[in-house]
Amino acid sequence: MARVTVEDCIDKVDNRFDLVLLAAHRARMISSGSQLTIDRDNDKNPVVSLREIADQTISPEDLREELVHSLQKFVEVDEPEPDTVPLIGSAGASVDADDTEVAVERMTEEELLKGLEGLAPPEEQPEEDE
């Protein structure tokens, strides 16, 4: 069997660094049970992945997308925007989305400070060594 070299794959993937990343990702996919597209011929997974790239049985663009997807921690999902929901306190009165008037409850500074005091944790007392 002929040895797979980087020169066999470099015309499929221009950048050698990208080639190494893609071949390593494909080798990990094979290790995790992904289906082979060529015969193994007693080769190890990195060699099989390079042979797959050289023989163009797997697309480098598809590998790149799968690699990016595997590295993402949070997958962005386009969720539909929520429809306009009527307010609970409106008692059946419909509220237009174009209303710009907003009712704001005013409070004095003293009321605000009293409210904040209730939210603040109690001060810690220093511990004394005995």
Curated annotation (Swiss-Prot):
| Alphabetic keyword roster | DNA-directed RNA polymerase, Nucleotidyltransferase, Transcription, Transferase
Write down the superkingdom of origin. Answer: Bacteria
- Record bears the keyword Disulfide bond: no
Tell me the segments the record calls region Disordered: 109-130
User: Does the record's keyword annotation contain Transferase?
Assistant: yes
> So what EC number does this one have?
2.7.7.6
Q: Name one GO cellular component term.
A: DNA-directed RNA polymerase complex
Reaction(s) catalysed (UniProt annotation): RNA(n) + a ribonucleoside 5'-triphosphate = RNA(n+1) + diphosphate
- A GO BP annotation: DNA-templated transcription
Q: Which Pfam families does this one have? A: RNA_pol_Rpb6 (PF01192)
User: What's one GO MF term for it?
Assistant: DNA-directed RNA polymerase activity
List cystine links: none
Explain the purpose of this protein.
Promotes RNA polymerase assembly. Latches the N- and C-terminal regions of the beta' subunit thereby facilitating its interaction with the beta and alpha subunits.
List the NCBIfam families hit by this protein, alphabetically.
rpoZ (TIGR00690)
Q: Subunit info?
A: The RNAP catalytic core consists of 2 alpha, 1 beta, 1 beta' and 1 omega subunit. When a sigma factor is associated with the core the holoenzyme is formed, which can initiate transcription.
The family assignment reads: Belongs to the RNA polymerase subunit omega family.
The protein in question is named DNA-directed RNA polymerase subunit omega
